[in-house]
Amino acid sequence: MASEELSLDELFERLERMPVPEGYKVEIVEGNIFMSPQRDIHWNIIRRLVRALEDRFGMDVNVLSDVRMDFPDKNGFAPDVAKLADDAEKDARGRWRYQDIEWIAEVISKGTAVSDYGPKKDAYAKAAIPIYLVVDPYVGRCHLYTEPKEGEYHSHLTVDFGTEIDLTAAGLELTLKTDEFPRD
């Protein structure tokens, strides 16, 4: 008997009817459901990233956090931080388009590390997200992926917390300070 493959919308509709524990984030990665707990250190870094974007681009910067966005290959993510183009508009279904994303940052947790470094990185490269930043509070490092081509990132920079990350060459007029990122 053939199984019926559900669309992302159908999967998310089913998730909305399920009792998801409070404080958990739910995403669909390559058609599989992942739940991960939100932690205070995780949120503290996200807040610092959003503030850095607001400080540089103003309070009206088009930035989202934990908002569902659909990506190629049955991936429905809620990036920790996503900066969209100033002229980005929602599609006919009322959703933001991944084609308008200029920058994504994911702060890993123990439960999301494999996904953030693997399938999510691959999906973001396939979607040609220009800048993908992985912040790892467990080892105190940031991984910057840029130059997406043919489904892969062709540039990778690793820096320790405390090192500034200049995103200008990657197309975003921002130098990100990491010296106050907390470690877990």
Where are these regions (language model features)?
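Gly/Pro/Ser/Thr-rich low-complexity, intrinsically disordered segments predominantly at protein N-termini
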Residues: 1-127, 131-184
